[in-house]
Amino acid sequence: MLLEDRVVLVDEGGERTGWAEKSTIHSASTPLHLAFSCYLFDEAGRVLVTRRALTKRTWPGVWTNSFCGHPGPGEPMTSAIERHARHELGVDIGDIREVLPDFRYTATDASGIVENEICPVYVARSRGLIVANPNEVAEWAWIDATDLIAAVDATPRLVSPWSALQVPLMRAELLAMGGVA
């Protein structure tokens, strides 16, 4: 079994308690597990937004942050973030920084699948061109951070539930990364 096929289970305090196979974890009664969200910026200060592939099990076709994922058992979070950036976007990244260390959410998608995650949020810089994996990303766009904030403020239901919650909490960080202070 590959590292990326496992999800780390955690208790209410965020302590690792074990792992489960990723293919069995997301259901109507998803246990609390560890994940991450990352907002990727280019050299012009734009943030990458992606539309999830239509074949994704959860929230297919929904616009969201740059990428998300789960660390494997024993895998450092920054290694998991770098691994997912390469897998989903075909890009190397740098300057990874945690901006919302205690973010947690629960959400249910249209099919009844529940996300139940302790999901620290990171920002990073792209170190190359995006070559999106079509099994992960249907579309993508580099946009100004101010446009992302305005879109989420105006119509939060049109983005993933985690992005709708994260963007208002990290407004200052998004603007700073985008060169707007």
Give names to the regions the model predicted.
Residues L48-V49, S66-L100:
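The catalytic Nudix box helix
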Residues E12-E15, G45, G90, G112:
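Detector for glycine-centered tight turns/loop "hinges" at secondary-structure junctions
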